[in-house]
């Protein structure tokens, strides 16, 4: 399980870092800004998770591989942006992949540290949405989790699959893959078809008068 968590964490860090770097390039940040954003976006969710469950120091600052994959993602995006631009909505695709991977890896790590299933699922969701929130805040945007298509709900759904599979003693690898696929699919379908949670209805001008 430790190997699976490490692989998921590193892949999730890489794709989230790609989303941060891509957003930075679109905003025409310099190379330092791109690398900073790629590291922060790629690692803030995992750092938050590790601090909450007491896994200190967090893996992102104690294992050089996290810094390495973050810098690699930033440099690829900075020097070869044309490769990234060929993808459909690259920021959204990378963000969805990072969301899915961190949601399931965060849930698995929370379970491994003894959290109950409900709290493990919530922490998995928090791990997933952390990177996207950091990216949007640093770029002075309202975080996607607060304003757009299904985001946190997709992460929670993927985390729930992992938790249910763990309770039913299904193979960890299978439920982790299933949870990640569900989360990623929900996120992309929400983007494609505009699925979103209800928003508060604003009173009409005539009603206020």
Task: Please report, for each region that a protein language model flagged, where it lies by residue.
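C-terminal ends of transmembrane helices
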Residues: 17-27, 50, 75-88, 133-144, ...
């Amino acid at each position: 399980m430790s190997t699976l968590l490490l692989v998921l964490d590193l892949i999730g860090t890489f794709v989230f870092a790609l989303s941060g770097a891509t957003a930075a390039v679109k905003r025409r940040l310099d190379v330092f800004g791109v690398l900073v954003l790629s590291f922060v976006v790629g690692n803030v969710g995992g750092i938050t998770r590790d601090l909450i469950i007491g896994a200190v120091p967090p893996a992102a600052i104690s294992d050089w591989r996290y810094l390495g994959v973050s810098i690699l993602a930033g440099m690829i995006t900075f020097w070869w942006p044309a490769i990234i631009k060929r993808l459909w909505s690259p920021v959204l695709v990378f963000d969805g992949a990072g969301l899915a991977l961190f949601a399931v890896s965060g849930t698995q790590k929370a379970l491994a540290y003894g959290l109950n299933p409900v709290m493990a699922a919530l922490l998995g969701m928090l791990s997933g949405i952390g990177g996207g929130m950091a990216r949007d805040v640093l770029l002075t945007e309202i975080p996607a989790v607060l304003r757009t298509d299904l985001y946190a709900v997709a992460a929670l759904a993927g985390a729930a699959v992992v938790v249910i599979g763990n309770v039913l003693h299904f193979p960890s690898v299978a439920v982790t893959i299933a949870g990640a696929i569900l989360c990623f699919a929900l996120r992309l379908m929400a983007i494609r078809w505009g699925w979103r949670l209800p928003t508060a209805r604003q009173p009409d001008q005539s009603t206020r008068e």
